Amino acid sequence: MTMASDPFSVLGLAADFDVDAREVEGAYLRRAAEAHPDVLGGDDEAAEALVGQLNEARAVLLDAERRANALLALRGGPAKEADKSLPTGFLMEMMQTREEIEDALRSKDAERIRSWRAWAESQRTGYVERVSRLFREGGSHNLVEVRRQLNAWRYVERLIEQMDAGAGCGAA
């Protein structure tokens, strides 16, 4: 991962999963001020490129799932393309869950959709907590488990996206 693709380095932050959003915003604003064309000697093209990198780094670090993927890559963990493993029984559970969510969306049952949304949010919170713990514990053996958790987490995010699209975002 190059500095340009390492969001932590781009913003000058320590490569850590547990970053504070205010810290990310502060680092972003400091670096954005440095990216002004006047500071860069009037080089508008360089300023524009740097602002693009800063915006992407900020977006990655403010999104827990994207931040975890970036940190996993930095630590040499498996890429999602190379490791599609999931927790035991997870895929069957997700197939059943997706079916029930689709049924709730088809029937426009606002209460069931709200209930499933709350379930998905609690699942997301659980993945954030597990991934955070695994990164804090360290060790290369945990990197494989981080990937497995991220693969499962992505399924939950897709369910949330499906509910948002199907319910017109009014189910939250």
Name what the model sees in each region.
Residues M1-A172:
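C-terminal accessory/regulatory regions appended to core domains
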